[in-house]
Amino acid sequence: MRYLFFIFFCVYQQLCFSQAIANIGVNLPSVALLDVEPKGEIIRLKFDNPSEAGKALQNSESSDIKWLNFTSALPLGSSRHISVQITSERLSSGYEIILETSGFTGVGAGILGNSVPLVNLSNSPVRIIDNIGGAFTGDGLNNGYKLKFSLIINDYSLLKGESNVYAIIFTLTDN
């Protein structure tokens, strides 16, 4: 009896159930997108005049904060980094522009890299985020890496009373 039941079950399964196989191809392109938010606003750094003769110039606290957003998709085992540099004329003598990069904040996910907290900007690229893998930071303000710029006087004898505008470029590069 068991034998008949087993045969009946096997025949029933073949008649009532069927399977088919479909192959699905997935193509994930390499993606490297980088954005600075908010767009179009100039970062204004300045020194305030001292209130009394004999006092040093004061670095005016900048309220201009930028956010660095990125999306990265790359082959397994690969990584990327983000560098920054001044691409316009050479930085005037007597002061330095310092970039402070926070740790990651926001809604993103993946291998978001490690920030280098403080760098001096120059005409040569300087890494600010290393070891980026497949990741996204989220878009807009309060997502990604917070960027804060400041000025430091390094030689009073070289300072000139002038105004300059510097172009700063951020680059997302494969390692």
Residue spans for each PLM region:
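Surface-exposed loop/turn segments flanking beta-strands in extracellular/periplasmic regions
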Residues: V107-V119
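N-terminal small/polar-rich segments of proteins
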Residues: Q19-G110, R127-N175
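Extracellular beta-sheet repeat scaffolds used for adhesion and glycan interaction
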Residues: N120-V126
